[in-house]
């Protein structure tokens, strides 16, 4: 790992409606082709992802080939699920040659034991969010969702996003942030010296 340049990103929330952001990311990948890089994407690369079979999604035809070109030239790619794109699956992983990381995940960074996470599971003060997170991450919920048609999944995803935005209006920033005591406990539980996470956009 010492010969690799490690890059950590999260929460790009790429969306078909925000082409500028997507193009910046694609230029970043292009500029690093052939370099000795390990790119870690710690969740929410996409603003939403309803399944690997949604091939009509413009981001699929733009981002997946770019990631494949990136990894084909020697770069490494590790992807962690976020709260918006936890349905990224084995097909996406195979097409992009990405390693799907469990959350949390321990790595050694130049001798420092480091915990990687998207981070949303540490927002424990937001009880409503944690209940929803537990539901949608269950195998039963995901299997049922993936049985729906593409159109039905898009509509449900839109409804969930609208409800989420409405819910945020009635919550303080502190409630939606990670709980410091929960993060402190993660340091102890995983015996690590550093934590790198996303989700909170701070």
Residue ranges of predicted features:
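N-terminal short leaders/motifs
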Residues: 47-70, 150, 162-173, 190-195
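Short, catalytically relevant binding-site loops at active-site mouths
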Residues: 46, 85-86, 121-123, 202
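Conserved beta-sheet core of the metallophosphoesterase superfamily
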Residues: 99-102, 113-115, 120, 126-131, ...
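Generic alpha-helical secondary structure signal
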Residues: 23, 58-61, 65, 130, ...
